[in-house]
Design a protein with these regions (language model features):
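Short coil turns that connect the paired helices of HEAT/ARM alpha-solenoid repeats
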Residues: 14-19, 48-54, 79-86, 114, ...
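Structural detector for internal amphipathic alpha-helices that build alpha-solenoid repeat scaffolds
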Residues: 1, 11, 19-35, 54-68, ...
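Eukaryotic protein-protein interaction scaffolds centered on beta-propeller repeats
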Residues: 143-157, 161-173
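Amphipathic alpha-helical scaffolding segments comprising HEAT/armadillo-like alpha-solenoid repeats
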Residues: 2-13, 34-48, 69-81, 101-117, ...
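Short, surface-exposed, charged/polar-biased interaction segments
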Residues: 26, 30, 61, 65, ...
Length: 173
């Protein structure tokens, strides 16, 4: 996407087709992230309430870069449906890796800490793990606390239970 493609992106984000809206938002995200645009159109802001959680999440990510950090991050932290929490957290994790965006996330630390503590810890790729990952990225949690002791023990049990490699790597016997 380029600035010259903005009229096409505007049509795309207003489309009744979810695929068009999604890719239109992705185009806006690229331009916003690269500081090629700095105005947030109302149509894009309205997509924070899109029924498709992927579109809403990408729109939220985008509006943060367009000066609407409060609205965007609030949408990523608070899903419409609990089952979609990981979608928003995925975008929030990307934002937390950008040093320029970290201060915008900090007002939401209490929500993230609560999610990190209360959401399931042992499920693979669970939202609690994602919340803890965001806190690690922000420097609010030690990387050693990313996984709980039960998960660590479970991992050790799995590794100790594996069949030994024969022959060993780099051995000549």
């Amino acid at each position: 996407a380029t600035v010259a493609s903005l009229p096409i992106l505007e049509k795309a984000i207003a489309s009744p087709l979810p695929e068009m809206r999604f890719w239109g938002v992705v185009g806006y995200a690229k331009l916003a992230r690269e500081n090629q645009i700095n105005i947030c159109p109302q149509t894009l802001l309205a997509l924070l309430q899109d029924e498709n959680p992927y579109i809403a999440s990408e729109a939220a990510y985008t509006v943060v870069y367009l000066g609407k950090a409060q609205e965007g991050i609030a949408r990523l932290i608070t899903p419409v449906q609990e089952k979609d929490r990981k979608i928003g957290y995925s975008s929030l994790e990307c934002l937390s890796l950008d040093p320029e965006m970290r201060d915008y996330i900090r007002p939401f630390l209490s929500e993230l800490k609560e999610a990190a503590e209360n959401l399931p810890r042992l499920e693979n790729e669970d939202a609690g793990l994602m919340a803890r990952g965001i806190l690690v990225n922000l420097g609010e949690m030690d990387i050693k606390d990313l996984h709980c002791p039960e998960a660590y023990k479970k991992g050790l049990k799995l590794n100790y239970g594996r069949r030994a490699m024969v022959p060993l790597p780099n051995s000549f016997e």
